[in-house]
A protein has these predicted regions:
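N-terminal pro-sequences and low-complexity stem/linker regions of secreted or lumenal proteins
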Residues: 35-486
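Exposed boundary/loop context
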Residues: 3-5, 29, 237, 437
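Basic polycationic patches enriched in arginine
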Residues: 12-15, 35
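Bacterial N-terminal signal peptides
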Residues: 17-29
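N-terminal signal peptide c-region/cleavage motif recognized by signal peptidases
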Residues: 31-33
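N-terminal secretory signal peptides that target proteins for export/translocation
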Residues: 1-13
Length: 486
């Protein structure tokens, strides 16, 4: 059989496989929790990278639910299946990955809209009638920050320094706002997901379809994949430890809402992150995991790869929770990445750690993914060479699909998600070696530490999530470190 060659029988087999996979995940979860098994992990390290789908990174990994044989996509709805997967290099274009983009790609479960979602007029034409949720005003406060004023009531907030946002400049190559601190806002200032341009998605949607000829040469990379020649370290981790092939982003859309799910099991109905030419400044009123950790005396730290880690941005929304506005009590818990290495060597690593990259090391297109891969590898090597290896679990995830193709329709557990699959690696002496097919999302990370420390769930999302316990085998002989060097 030729690469990617399959037919209707293959589709039916794949659907049967997915059904069996879901049933098995529920059985595994029940068996693990019913045993009341203790968890000999004392340090959880969550490394969060950027913007790649599962099929983009592991679509050809042996044993994983990867790119189907014969996979092909149309350039426009109802068009011929003329586009096929291509092997990409270390640098890929940045594709749209807003709420609307994800809905266009999803196409009611057909998973065939990745090309037409990228046309400049696609949102105006094809997105007509797609509802866009608005933030719950009881959970999210939206304020416009301009160059002339800081929103009232935020002057005492450590992260309210206007230079962090008002000096951000639109980078036409990266298609992002990039600030002096090195972070990016992934959405165009004319983002129709928010603000007065919402009417583009309703009765006033554009009457003319996108062109179907002369597509940009970079567009083909939305249907691309990488292999072990491009990201060899990640593939080595996948072979040596655990690869999850049913790990979904928590909602369809960009970074900020998914990072909120990562720490709070909700986004307050927020599905976007900026628009209308102004930096949109949010304050969040709902609880998050660090509240639970603090109340339970579980140590934690957020390590951030920017010049001032206390500044809130789309990959680190913690400083923008309203409860920290006048009393920035979480300041000792937010540190630069260098502090992570110090904590490893000084024996002061907290029980729960999050690692958020700089833009250069994030793998966010068009950044070189190998630069991000080696940043992650250095972190993993440092843990493996420390005293913490014997008692740790390192979980590496990517925060959203980045506009890249994935063939698995995400389960629609509520109006917000799941979003598309993203890669997830579990690296631990107790990793269950191989591919785990259990369904997870970012709230599964919350469920894991809630289970370990007997914490109450934050929302129904983490209450109902699988906790990733079946990624571990606590009765096995502990696995040795796998040190990777250049």
């Amino acid at each position: 059989m030729k690469p990617f060659e399959f037919g209707l029988l293959g589709v039916r087999k794949r659907r049967l496989f997915l059904a069996i996979q879901l049933a098995a995940s529920l059985l595994v979860w029940t068996s693990v929790t019913s045993r009341g098994q203790s968890i000999p992990i004392e340090h959880f390290i969550f490394i969060v990278q950027e913007n790649h789908s599962f099929d983009n990174y592991f679509g050809t990994f042996p044993g994983a639910n990867g790119i189907p044989a014969g996979a092909a996509l149309p350039d426009y709805p109802g068009g011929p299946l003329t586009e096929h997967p291509i092997l990409a290099g270390a640098k890929q274009p940045d594709f749209g990955h807003k709420w609307i983009d994800s809905k266009l790609c999803y196409d009611n479960g057909a998973m065939d809209g990745f090309f037409w979602a990228e046309w400049p007029e696609a949102e105006r034409y094809y997105a007509k009638g797609i509802p866009v949720p608005t933030p719950d005003p009881n959970l999210v406060v939206k304020l416009n920050k301009t160059s002339s004023a800081v929103p009232a009531g935020t002057a005492s907030k450590k992260n309210s320094a206007p230079k962090s946002t008002v000096e951000s400049k639109w980078d036409p190559v990266m298609k992002e706002y990039v600030s002096p601190n090195g972070f990016a806002d992934e959405e165009d200032p004319d983002d129709p997901d928010v603000g007065p341009k919402n009417d583009l998605l309703g009765a006033n949607a554009g009457p003319t379809p996108p062109p179907i000829k002369d597509q940009p040469p970079t567009l083909k990379y939305t249907f691309s994949y990488l292999d072990d020649t491009v990201i060899p370290n990640y593939w080595k981790y996948a072979r040596s430890f655990t690869l999850c092939d049913a790990f979904f982003s928590s909602m369809g859309g960009p970074s900020l809402p998914n990072h909120l799910y990562l720490i709070a099991a909700q986004s307050g109905d927020l599905v976007s992150q900026s628009g209308n030419g102004h930096w949109i400044y949010y304050e969040f009123l709902f609880p998050n995991i660090v509240d639970l950790l603090g109340n339970a005396n579980v140590s934690w730290k957020y390590y951030v790869g920017v010049s001032d880690p206390s500044l809130a941005y789309i990959w680190d929304p913690l400083p923008d929770f309203q409860k920290y506005e006048t009393n920035f009590q979480i300041a000792p818990h937010i540190a630069a990445t260098d502090k992570f290495y110090q904590d490893l060597t000084q024996g002061t690593l907290p029980q729960v750690s999050y690692l958020i990259p700089s833009i250069a090391k994030s793998e966010h297109p068009p950044q070189d993914v190998q630069g991000g891969m080696w940043y992650v590898t250095d972190l993993v090597n440092a843990v493996m060479q420390s005293k913490y290896w014997s008692s740790c679990a390192i979980i590496i995830v990517w925060d959203d699909y980045g506009g890249f193709y994935d063939h698995v329709p995400p389960p629609q557990v509520d109006t917000h998600g799941y979003g598309f699959r993203v890669p997830a690696l579990v690296i631990s002496p107790y990793s269950s070696v191989g591919v785990v097919h259990t369904t997870y999302d970012f709230t599964s990370l919350l469920k894991l530490i809630e289970t370990k420390y007997n914490l109450s769930p934050l929302t129904s999302r983490d209450a109902n999530a699988n906790s990733m316990l079946d990624c571990f085998n606590f009765s096995q002989t502990p696995l040795p470190p796998v040190i990777i060097t250049k």
